[in-house]
Amino acid sequence: MNAVIEQRKVLLEIADLKVHFDIKEGKQWFWQPPKTLKAVDGVTLRLYEGETLGVVGESGCGKSTFARAIIGLVKATDGKVAWLGKDLLGMKADEWREVRSDIQMIFQDPLASLNPRMTIGEIIAEPLRTYHPKLSRQDVRDRVKAMMLKVGLLPNLINRYPHEFSGGQCQRIGIARALILEPKLIICDEPVSALDVSIQAQVVNLLQQLQREMGLSLIFIAHDLAVVKHISDRVLVMYLGHAVELGTYDEVYHNPLHPYTKALMSAVPIPDPDLERNKKIQLLEGELPSPINPPSGCVFRTRCPIAGPECAQTRPVLEGSFRHAVSCLKVDPL
């Protein structure tokens, strides 16, 4: 399966992507230069046609900022983001407009992402009216109803408002809005974290079904490692704005190489109570460093159980193969 993915067309190519924010503290004198918060600091990867890339990491590691930088909701500081060979970071507004019909986003809070003053029919139809203004009202209505059926919503609910729906239904509305233009890539920014567990499974299964039917590529961001394993072809592990491990889901989950990934995977619950009782969880010592003042060299070295003197001097880079790559001076990716 993964060998087949590698042979497919590259949709998205990201090289050394950086997103930095200038931070000015209240007690800082005006002549002092602002401090820099490094939210994303040098992520490189490729996304292939029809692939699902899972992105995991603890809160504050830069997952959502990374996703928003791809679609232009956050301005990138440096690096390259190429969509079908076109550099997105240097695009003008009219060129971006064309690309955005191919790249859509599903947000974390389903209700907050919907306009409370608009009916769900108007919400789902808004991208159509923006990109296809010549469509008749009946054509727009027909397409909206067809998309509602596709995501599991009854068309006779078209004139209702977001507050009349449950969280899972609101997320389906958000999915319908993202898919109405038939994009090639959907960025899912923790789309199930605000939902009940039973509803999470329904939304994940719906995304997989729509991916098969429409040939979508997905970037799926989540905290729940079990959900990411279920839906992903490859998994990217982020820590403090850096990519520390990237590989197929079976390699990352069953043969993690980076110490941070090993700690994450050791915390995944096991259904068997006997195995769960005897499982050893690898605890990380210390606090997550500040992205304003990250450690020198390897950013994980202050919490790493195998760090050496060289880890403070040299910053590791992601090395390895398509199946498995790791960013660690102490680990051989081969």
Swiss-Prot record:
Main location: membrane
Organism: Salmonella typhimurium (strain LT2 / SGSC1412 / ATCC 700720)
Gene Ontology process terms (BP): peptide transport; protein transport; transmembrane transport
Binding site for ATP: 57-64
Name of the protein this chain belongs to: Oligopeptide transport ATP-binding protein OppF
GO cellular component: plasma membrane
Record's keyword terms, sorted: ATP-binding, Cell inner membrane, Cell membrane, Membrane, Nucleotide-binding, Peptide transport, Protein transport, Translocase, Transport
InterPro entries: AAA+_ATPase, ABC_transp_ATP-bind, ABC_transporter-like_ATP-bd, ABC_transporter-like_CS, Oligopep_ABC_C, P-loop_NTPase
GO molecular function: ATP binding; ATP hydrolysis activity
Membrane topology: Peripheral membrane protein
Catalytic activity, as annotated: a [peptide](out) + ATP + H2O = a [peptide](in) + ADP + phosphate + H(+); L-alanyl-gamma-D-glutamyl-meso-2,6-diaminopimelate(out) + ATP + H2O = L-alanyl-gamma-D-glutamyl-meso-2,6-diaminopimelate(in) + ADP + phosphate + H(+)
Pfam family, one: ABC_tran
Subcellular location: Cell inner membrane
Family the UniProt entry places it in: Belongs to the ABC transporter superfamily.
Conditions for induction: Part of the opp operon, which is constitutively expressed.
Function noted in UniProt: Part of the ABC transporter complex OppABCDF involved in the uptake of oligopeptides, including the cell wall murein tripeptide L-alanyl-gamma-D-glutamyl-meso-diaminopimelate. Probably responsible for energy coupling to the transport system. Plays an important nutritional role and is involved in the recycling of cell wall peptides.
Annotated EC: 7.4.2.6
Domain ABC transporter stretches: 12-265
Lineage: Bacteria, Pseudomonadati, Pseudomonadota, Gammaproteobacteria, Enterobacterales
CDD domains documented for this protein: ABC_NikE_OppD_transporters (cd03257)
Quaternary data: The complex is composed of two ATP-binding proteins (OppD and OppF), two transmembrane proteins (OppB and OppC) and a solute-binding protein (OppA).
